[in-house]
Amino acid sequence: MHSPDQLRPKRCRDGRFQIREKKERNWRFNRDLYLAVGEVWSWNDKRVWTDEQWKEYGLAPELRTFSAYYENSLAGYYELCRDNEGGVEIAYFGLLPEFIGRGLGGALLTSAIEEAWRMSPSVTRVWVHTCTLDHPLALANYQARGMVIYKREAAES
């Protein structure tokens, strides 16, 4: 996505759903959410990381983490990572299993895209990687919010 005007937002009218930035950095939070959200989708790239690797990642100045709550219960999260070329990647994004199917994913993604554009006036692109291991409707959600496919790759198994 190359402009905030391309966003087609989806709002959650349920006031019990709230999204907040984690102002106090805690690499364990990033690790635990990655493991909890990603377990269902077989996220494995960081599963073997040491605590030191998680600390370096979770405390990196270019990373911002947001958590979603439903009735004060943790429901999901997303991470935004700014690069040196004006891009912001939605590095990780997802809901905990018990919150999937409640219509919250579109609102969570809308928040992620809006916050990515707010990171700096110099942001020129917001992007995300997805794969066939993600939720079956992940790509449809990205496209419904205005994102377009940039490139397809076949991964070796």
Per-segment meaning from a language model:
Residues 67, 73-82, 89-94:
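Conserved beta-strand in the GNAT
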Residues 1-23:
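Acyl-donor-binding surface of acyltransferase catalytic domains
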Residues 82-91, 100, 122-124:
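A conserved beta-turn-beta hairpin within the catalytic core of GNAT-like acetyltransferases
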Residues 38-53:
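Conserved GNAT-fold acetyl-CoA-binding loop/helix
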Residues 15-39:
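Short, contiguous, helix-prone interaction/anchoring segments in small proteins
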Residues 100, 126-138, 155-157:
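Conserved beta-strand-loop-alpha-helix junction that forms the acyl-donor binding cleft
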Residues 55-67:
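A short helix-loop-beta-strand connector motif used in the catalytic cores of GNAT acetyltransferases and
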